[in-house]
Amino acid sequence: MNALNAAMTVIGAGSYGTALAITLARNGHHVVLWGHDPKHIATLQHDRCNAAFLPDVPFPDTLHLESDLATALAASRDILVVVPSHVFGQVLRQIKPLMRSDARLVWATKGLEAETGRLLQDVAREALGDDIPLAVISGPTFAKELAAGLPTAISLAATDPQFAEDLQRLLHCGKSFRVYINPDFIGVQLGGAVKNVIAIGAGMSDGIGFGANARTALITRGLVEMSRLGAALGADPETFMGMAGLGDLVLTCTDNQSRNRRFGMMLGQGMDVQSAQDKIGQVVEGYRNTKEVRVLAQRLGVEMPITEEIYQVLYCGKIAREAALTLLGRARKDERSSN
């Protein structure tokens, strides 16, 4: 591979970053995958698979591993960032001085800025300036299924229409991976953050043993909270009926591949927060997302009772069953009321 002819550089060699890199490479593109740990990258290069997360999926020949950040960023104008939300800004500040002058940035990170609850678009603008084209991909995607080539669909939103079309062309595969362009840049970002919170709640409900009716009610009312917060930010309500909203929400709330759901189930069964996190063994994005979404909702004056009760369990020591009973005991309301 010539140092300047990769179609995409992927920043983040965890399970999802690796799965996206495999998908791009499987489409016939040269892809560079960078990770912060040189030993991990060396292992990936030696094994030609991500044995820790995706052991049964060999790397295509066009997937190239790189531990030197400058070399990785020189390889392509298009950069796909796939890192946890709490280090998103830090990573962007790290890559900025090494990016090409014609660089374009897309992320698959789901969440908001740690502590502030800011949208990742605002974090990106602050770190990289106003001129660089930005994009986000989001939707119901478990890394294992994506890497295996099982049918998957996502939403893609970008600040520049040409960038959106270019990304759709790179990612879309008629056999297994459908990429839908959505003009709602805010909504596509927000759905991925809120769904992680609601998935913890769905897991709690199942861990308590409340059954399918309760889980479905929680998912539905969680979608209401997502849409309510989105409306306050100027998002299009229809976005939350698509892949980045309802699609991702249903997947994460109902399948045990979801770390957020499994984490919530453990809490519902009586395990404490730290022990549940330790047992999961990987980042549980919804843990941080809950605090971030709550901060954003309070700043905008949006009532999100499910999010609030999950916050009380995660950060204030409330028992999951007590949180559920608080929600069930709320005053009678019109289904379409704003609170």
From Swiss-Prot:
Reaction it catalyzes: sn-glycerol 3-phosphate + NAD(+) = dihydroxyacetone phosphate + NADH + H(+); sn-glycerol 3-phosphate + NADP(+) = dihydroxyacetone phosphate + NADPH + H(+)
Superkingdom assignment: Bacteria
Active-site annotation: K195
Recorded family membership: Belongs to the NAD-dependent glycerol-3-phosphate dehydrogenase family.
Binding residues annotated for NADPH, in chain numbering: S15, Y16, H36, K110, A143, R259, V283, E285
Keyword check for Electron transport: no
Positions annotated to bind sn-glycerol 3-phosphate: K110, G139, T141, K195, D248, S258, R259, N260
GO CC list: cytosol
Location within or outside the cell: Cytoplasm
Protein name: Glycerol-3-phosphate dehydrogenase [NAD(P)+]
One GO BP: carbohydrate metabolic process
Its EC number(s): 1.1.1.94
Entry-linked PROSITE patterns: NAD_G3PDH
A GO term, aspect molecular function: glycerol-3-phosphate dehydrogenase [NAD(P)+] activity
Pathway where it operates: Membrane lipid metabolism; glycerophospholipid metabolism
Keywords, ordered alphabetically: Cytoplasm, Lipid biosynthesis, Lipid metabolism, NAD, NADP, Nucleotide-binding, Oxidoreductase, Phospholipid biosynthesis, Phospholipid metabolism
SUPFAM superfamilies assigned to the protein according to its UniProt record, in alphabetical order: 6-phosphogluconate dehydrogenase C-terminal domain-like, NAD(P)-binding Rossmann-fold domains
Function text: Catalyzes the reduction of the glycolytic intermediate dihydroxyacetone phosphate (DHAP) to sn-glycerol 3-phosphate (G3P), the key precursor for phospholipid synthesis.
